[in-house]
Amino acid sequence: MSRVQLALNVSDLESAVDFYSKLFGTEPAKRKPGYANFAIADPPLKLVLFEGAEGGTLNHLGVETENAAEVEAAEARLSSDGLETTGIDDTICCYATKVETWVVDPDGARWEWYVKTGDSDQLTNEIVSGGDTEAMCCAPVPSEPVTLGRVAETAPASSGGGCC
């Protein structure tokens, strides 16, 4: 099975592990000082956390689902685990109509759980119906980008695989 890998720098590993355990409903596959990784089955994702680095920016992260029921189930699970969400919104944003919910991690990275329901000619956010009238959008947010660092450069990995 193939899966996307996402490597994030975090300021507080314990807070990040707690958040991502709740976000994806699973515990880390590996934990070391300053490091944790998750082998997430659904959606297929390898999430790697490095503590303490600086630099880089990130607009947002997301999970695209197959239907609105999956967005609703995710929002219910996130809320019941104590994470603050925007609620479920029918939204026009980023040239699409969507059903979505958003949550923000301990370092300010925005996560969107959504299903695309159609196309749109509009980039900026318009909430058609639903929860938070101040909901987030995937359109650029120039005023306060999330800053994520880069892992320090190291010698090339051996032919046996990468660093993670």
Placement of each model-derived feature along the sequence:
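N-terminal beta-strand motif that seeds the catalytic metal site of vicinal oxygen chelate
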Residues: 1-14, 44, 60-61, 120-164
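Core segments of cupin and vicinal oxygen chelate
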Residues: 1-46
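Residue-level recognition of strand-loop junctions within catalytic nucleotide-signaling folds
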Residues: 11, 50-52, 66
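Vicinal oxygen chelate
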Residues: 13, 62-110, 117-121
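Short secondary-structure transition/capping segments
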Residues: 41-42, 97-101, 128-129
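Conserved beta-strand in the GNAT
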Residues: 46-50, 112
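A short, sequence-level motif marking secondary-structure junctions
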Residues: 51-55, 118
